[in-house]
Design a protein with these regions (language model features):
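Short, small-residue-biased leader/transition segments that mark boundaries at the very start
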Residues: 1-3
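Flexible "cap/lid" subdomain of the alpha/beta-hydrolase fold that forms the substrate-access gate
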Residues: 6, 13, 49-85, 89-174
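Conserved HGGG/HGGXW glycine-rich cap/lid loop of the alpha/beta-hydrolase fold
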Residues: 7-53, 87
Length: 174
């Protein structure tokens, strides 16, 4: 189940998709403005965040599953089409939702993360190559149970790894 906070409007639907580690609340300042401009606004908690379901299996967080969640929100709200806006991790989710469901999406906006077309290798394999020997949160989450155990033991360590793990040159902070 995907948690959504909806503000009724009289116009087209805009689905707002947050980044990592955030929730729908990241959009709290944009929601009233977009609603006042005549849009119906749905800011969601992405699967695994906030009020949405949190499946244990890593495969439940595939891009296909995440894009299906966005389409599910559009359907649940009774709209045929929607405008999508995503920031950070929400960017790839909205870009891929649009690419896989072009007849359902009237516009897409990605903030802070550009569109990356599918390459010859998976995104995870690309990250493994780029971040060899360095911490990168998306790779960290691929190790089943490891992140969860470390969060419970020491949330501060997780936050330091996530926010202060590498500098602009890819060097690990100490």
């Amino acid at each position: 189940d995907v948690y959504k906070r909806q503000i009724e409007g009289s116009g087209p639907l805009i689905v707002l998709v947050h980044g990592c580690p955030e929730s729908w609340y990241s959009w709290r300042h944009q929601i009233p403005l977009l609603s006042e401009k005549g849009y119906t606004v749905a800011a969601i908690d992405v699967r695994g965040y906030g009020g949405s379901s949190k499946p244990y299996e890593i495969k439940a967080y595939s891009m296909r599953e995440l894009t299906n969640d966005v389409i599910g929100v559009i359907d649940a709200l009774g709209f045929e089409k929607a405008i999508l806006m995503g920031r950070d991790w929400g960017g790839p989710i909205v870009w891929n939702t649009a690419a896989l469901n072009e007849n359902r999406i009237s516009a897409v906006l990605g903030l802070s993360v550009p569109f990356f077309p599918r390459g010859k290798i998976s995104t995870i394999d690309l990250f493994k190559k780029i971040y060899q020997g360095k911490f990168f949160y998306q790779l960290y989450f691929q190790e089943e149970g490891v992140a969860e155990a470390e969060f419970e033991e020491n949330i501060r360590k997780y936050l330091e790894l996530t926010y202060f793990s590498i500098d602009a040159r890819g060097m690990r902070f100490q």
